[in-house]
């Protein structure tokens, strides 16, 4: 092989190696949290219920994983969901959480649009009961 061809081959190999090594560094696991209470609901209610949810979002696999718990609700939970929605606004269900019994645990693979909203703070989690069908406790999901 001529020196020029060898130099080109080595340059290409070095560039390919650098890209391959950098690729995993581009992936990120984002830690998220959502403290839940009745005053965060829209509209607020008088429940003494509280809860916490922690989550991680893996930007490479697009997987959202969560764990949470709650207590002191007015009755049994009838549903729990992640919703799209900014603080102070209600939004549609983005990801159901099932079962809704405490402790909560699960995972879901998100779409690009869902991930964008989640990481921008435009998601909340809430727990519903018979007494508060629209949601008894709510927490905005933040980093």
At which residue positions do the language-model features occur?
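Metal-centered catalytic cores of metalloenzymes
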Residues: 2-5, 12, 17, 21-80, ...
């Amino acid at each position: 092989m001529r020196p020029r061809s060898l130099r080109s081959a080595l340059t290409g190999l070095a560039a390919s190696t650098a890209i391959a090594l950098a690729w995993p560094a581009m992936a990120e696991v984002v830690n998220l949290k959502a403290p839940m209470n009745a005053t965060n609901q829209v509209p607020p209610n008088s429940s003494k219920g509280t809860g916490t949810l922690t989550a991680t979002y893996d930007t490479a696999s697009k997987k959202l994983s969560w764990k949470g718990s709650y207590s002191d609700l007015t009755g049994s939970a009838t549903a729990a969901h992640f919703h799209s929605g900014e603080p102070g606004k209600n939004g549609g269900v983005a990801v159901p959480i099932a079962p809704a019994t405490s402790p909560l645990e699960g995972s879901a693979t998100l779409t690009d649009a869902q991930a964008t909203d989640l990481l921008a703070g435009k998601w909340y989690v809430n727990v519903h009961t018979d007494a508060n069908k629209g949601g008894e406790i709510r927490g905005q999901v933040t980093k």
